[in-house]
Amino acid sequence: MRKEERLEEITKLINKRGTIRVTEVVERLKVSDMTVRRDLTELEGLGVLTRIHGGARSNNIFQYKEMSHEEKHSRQIEEKHYIAQKAAELVEEGDTIFLGPGTTVELLAEEINKTTLQVITNCLPVFQILSQKQSETFRVHLLGGEMRSITQSFIGEITNIVLEKMHFSKMFFSGNGVKGNEVMTSSFQEAYTQKMALGRAIEKYLLIDSSKIGKEDFTSFYQLSQLTALITDCQDDDKLQKLSKYTEIIN
């Protein structure tokens, strides 16, 4: 089991039970005592839990209950359409692009109107939208793996092994929150896959609506300063000024 998978399992367990013991985590995850203690120390550093004798106690910070795919589709619709249209202007003929999961990225998939393109995605809805546009010069690839139902995206070792062999001219992705320089999401595993894809893209564009600016989530997985640009509907001058310290803003 990879580290990000262990951290996610431990987080789920401790937030369900309130407290956990090292011995029960060792037995549940089939890893060493030392590995569990290192994981608990890392999660303590993230503010997820507090170490106590023989185990840990939840800090109950996992208060950001991730919305379902259907709920996300009903929020900030006009704003997401605006962002998707702006992002679509950056897609060029001949590009090889990676599209991550997220309802705003799905809207981008609908907006794409190029005829010579290669698109790779780990998101089932994005693939379903783009597969309607396939041709000899418009190719769409879906990465398989373990399905994360809440975002309908594929994650895990199989997904990541395939990703390691790929390179992209551009990547468009989203997140659940942006705070300071940090881009945040709810899942270690999904974050790991997103970060891996970002490392293989030349240009990197974050699609984020104004409701997510200033919002925290469970784990940080990328920094604004590493982006090519952030695409948003936000018109708040104060927020835009703060964001522009880290990256270019397209709005």
Swiss-Prot record:
The keyword Mitochondrion does not apply. Keywords: DNA-binding, Lactose metabolism, Repressor, Transcription, Transcription regulation. Residues 3-58 form the HTH deoR-type domain. One of its GO terms (biological process) is lactose metabolic process. It comes from the Bacteria. Disulfide bonds: none annotated. One of its GO terms (molecular function) is DNA binding. Pfam families: DeoRC, HTH_DeoR. Residues 20-39 bind DNA. Repressor of the lactose catabolism operon. Galactose-6-phosphate is the inducer. This is Lactose phosphotransferase system repressor. It comes from Streptococcus mutans serotype c (strain ATCC 700610 / UA159). The lineage of its organism: Bacteria, Bacillati, Bacillota, Bacilli, Lactobacillales.
